[in-house]
Amino acid sequence: MTRFRLTVEFDGRPFMGWQRQAHGPSVQQAIEEAITAVTGERAVIHAAGRTDARVHGRAMTAHADIAKPITPFRLKEALNARLRPAPVAILACEPVAGDWHARFSCVGRRYVYRIVNRRAPLTFDAGLAWQVAADLDDQAMHAAAQCLVGRHDFTTFRSAHCQAESPVKTLDRLDVRRSGELIEIEAAARSFLHHQVRSMVGCLALVGRGRWTAADLADALAAADRARLGLNAPPDGLYFMEAVYPAETGETAR
């Protein structure tokens, strides 16, 4: 039995999310069915994160245990062939230690949220970004975002369906940058609560529109009350960018 680490890219638009669902297609199901077709084995894959419906992945990390003798290259090529025409691609495949785990060995996760700030309808970016027609002050958004960095109770920014034991998380970075009409919001932490990134982005958009101040955002955080959330951004603009592991950071897994 060999444990393979998979790096997965996917367009979230056709899927109900990463995790298997009873009521619709998922990225996990697509990959597991491809593994079964290639190896003849019933596969269960584990991932660094579980994205919602219509959320995308640039480099989601997952792992699968496979008994059939197969090289990483042949496995990657065979899976990509089986996955077509689904918008899912295996970017990399490598053997790892049997105790390595895509979720539990992970020490950092990074997301990027894309906003297209223009009035004209989206053509190429439809379903791949959040269109905001009102002018956004990206500098005000970035300045306000810094009050969220650090260790806090993020109850205000947590979905009512979140299964995490504690709402306390440490946000390592929250940066807002603009290039023309594109605004990208980058968030990095060891882990996130359900809907945390989208909730933070929605409130930052209120700051960018001048409807909230930085103080309003800080007050919403301090309230630790989901009812104080100003706006939850849609899933379309959210991308899981990478998962970080101890060998890549020098940190010890815990």
Swiss-Prot record:
Catalytic reaction list: uridine(38/39/40) in tRNA = pseudouridine(38/39/40) in tRNA
Enzyme Commission (EC) number: 5.4.99.12
Any single biological process term in GO: tRNA pseudouridine synthesis
Record keywords: Isomerase, tRNA processing
Enzyme class, spelled out: isomerase
Superkingdom of this protein's organism: Bacteria
Residues engaged in binding substrate: 111
Annotated catalytic residues: 52
Family matches, as InterPro entries: PsdUridine_synth_cat_dom_sf (IPR020103), PsdUridine_synth_TruA (IPR001406), PsdUridine_synth_TruA_a/b_dom (IPR020097), PsdUridine_synth_TruA_C (IPR020095), TruA/RsuA/RluB/E/F_N (IPR020094)
Recorded GO MF terms: RNA binding; tRNA pseudouridine(38-40) synthase activity
UniProt subunit comment: Homodimer.
Role: Formation of pseudouridine at positions 38, 39 and 40 in the anticodon stem and loop of transfer RNAs.
PANTHER family: PSEUDOURIDYLATE SYNTHASE, TRNA PSEUDOURIDINE SYNTHASE-LIKE 1
Family recorded in the similarity comment: Belongs to the tRNA pseudouridine synthase TruA family.
Name listed for the protein in its UniProt record: tRNA pseudouridine synthase A
Organism, scientific name: Rhizorhabdus wittichii (strain DSM 6014 / CCUG 31198 / JCM 15750 / NBRC 105917 / EY 4224 / RW1)
Phylogenetic lineage: Bacteria, Pseudomonadati, Pseudomonadota, Alphaproteobacteria, Sphingomonadales
